[in-house]
């Protein structure tokens, strides 16, 4: 469960600070690079990559985005319960058990030729509604979707379900985030093949979407009429191989405070397994945050944090709820610690953490689930 109550700030020594102004800046920059005929959906799956789906969506709608995209039905339901009436697309295939809910909350769900359609038809009919769906096309990601050569047959099958309406179609590019766009362009060629079998493509309002963050940045031919920016909403670029790097900001800061300072004597070990041994007498400090909060254990003896605008090394193994760092004479109990983001002139970017633990910044931000959030405007 994630928390977004201002009161939590007064109860927790560790929290995530989300800068609304930085979020708004990114949303505005991305929207400004796209022509007016290309709509933007804000990808707010995984609670907006840890930034808070509802707050991100509120700002996105103010900045000209027309819809939300989430991974699962329950994420779409959460947006509806928070009062959002804009179109909400889900990106993952729904199960038959989710049919009633998808219809009830007016979600636009993906269906391909592997989905059992009868439960969705029955749910829509029983509720007196038309279920809007969009068709995922597998152009090479090999995750979900109908293959281009099977589209015509699938469309014929869909005619048997009068309470299911095709709202649009989409595909996902697997290698648009590298310099060589050959594979991405081949995927778009396959998408065009699939589109050629869809007479609906000529209808007003029919959604055609292929541009993920990498496509938004580097491939105007992928924009069609709906762009799906995801990671770039939150600061990081898809990779360091992008041809275009925009002026994006990082809204997220992970903050904690020093709870303990001590002197570690020469020859003494610290933490589980004693993986760090002091070569001389030294001051160390303890921070009440650990891998249960989503801070990677692989940063043990490798990562850094910021205290008083200076970098301090993580020493010993990161524990479930606590971790230890080197501490200079100026480090005191109660001092602010920044584990992700800016403090003074120093910054720890999610890309830095991702490089150390051999992952991507998406996972770094999405994994911080236990820590409460607060919002600021700066």
Where do the model's predicted regions map?
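Active-site anion/phosphate-binding pocket segments in diverse small-molecule metabolic enzymes
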Residues: 2-5, 9-20, 24, 75, ...
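Active-site-proximal beta-alpha core segment in soluble small-molecule metabolic enzymes
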Residues: 14-17, 24, 38-209
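Active-site phosphate/pyrophosphate- and oxyanion-stabilizing loops and adjacent acidic/basic residues
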Residues: 28, 156, 362
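Conserved PLP-enzyme active-site core in the AAT-like
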Residues: 33
């Amino acid at each position: 469960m994630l928390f977004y109550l201002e009161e939590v700030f007064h109860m927790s020594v560790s929290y995530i600070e989300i800068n609304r102004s930085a979020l708004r800046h990114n949303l505005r920059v991305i929207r400004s690079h796209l022509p007016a005929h290309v709509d933007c959906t804000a990808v707010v799956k995984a609670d907006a990559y840890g930034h808070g789906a509802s707050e991100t969506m509120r700002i996105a709608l103010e900045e000209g985005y027309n819809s939300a995209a989430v991974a699962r039905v329950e994420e779409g339901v959460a947006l509806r319960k928070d009062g959002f009436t804009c179109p909400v697309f889900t990106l993952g295939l729904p199960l038959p058990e989710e049919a009633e809910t998808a219809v009830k909350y007016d979600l636009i769900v993906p269906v391909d030729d592997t989905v059992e359609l009868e439960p969705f038809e029955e749910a829509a009919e029983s509720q007196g509604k038309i279920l809007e769906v969009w068709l995922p096309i597998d152009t090479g990601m090999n995750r979900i979707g109908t293959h281009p050569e099977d589209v015509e047959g699938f469309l014929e099958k869909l005619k048997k379900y009068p309470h299911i309406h095709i709202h649009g179609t989409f595909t996902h590019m697997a290698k648009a985030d590298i310099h060589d766009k050959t594979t991405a362009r081949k995927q778009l060629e396959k998408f065009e093949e699939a589109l050629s079998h869809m007479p609906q493509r000529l209808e007003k309002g029919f959604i055609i979407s292929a541009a993920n963050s990498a496509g938004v940045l580097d491939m105007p031919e992928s924009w069609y009429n709906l762009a799906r920016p995801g990671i770039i909403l939150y600061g990081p670029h898809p990779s360091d191989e992008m041809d275009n790097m925009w002026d994006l900001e990082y809204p997220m800061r992970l903050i904690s405070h020093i709870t303990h300072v001590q002197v570690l004597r020469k020859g003494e070990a610290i933490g589980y397994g004693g993986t760090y041994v002091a070569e001389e007498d030294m001051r160390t400090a303890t921070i009440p945050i650990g891998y249960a909060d989503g801070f990677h254990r692989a940063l043990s003896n490798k990562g850094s944090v910021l205290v008083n605008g200076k970098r301090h090394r993580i020493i010993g193994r990161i524990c479930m709820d606590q971790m230890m760092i080197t501490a200079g004479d100026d480090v005191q109990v109660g001092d602010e610690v920044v584990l992700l983001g800016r403090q003074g002139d120093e910054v720890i970017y999610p890309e830095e953490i991702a490089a150390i633990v051999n992952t991507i910044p998406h996972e770094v931000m999405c994994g911080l689930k236990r820590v409460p959030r607060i919002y600021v405007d700066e």
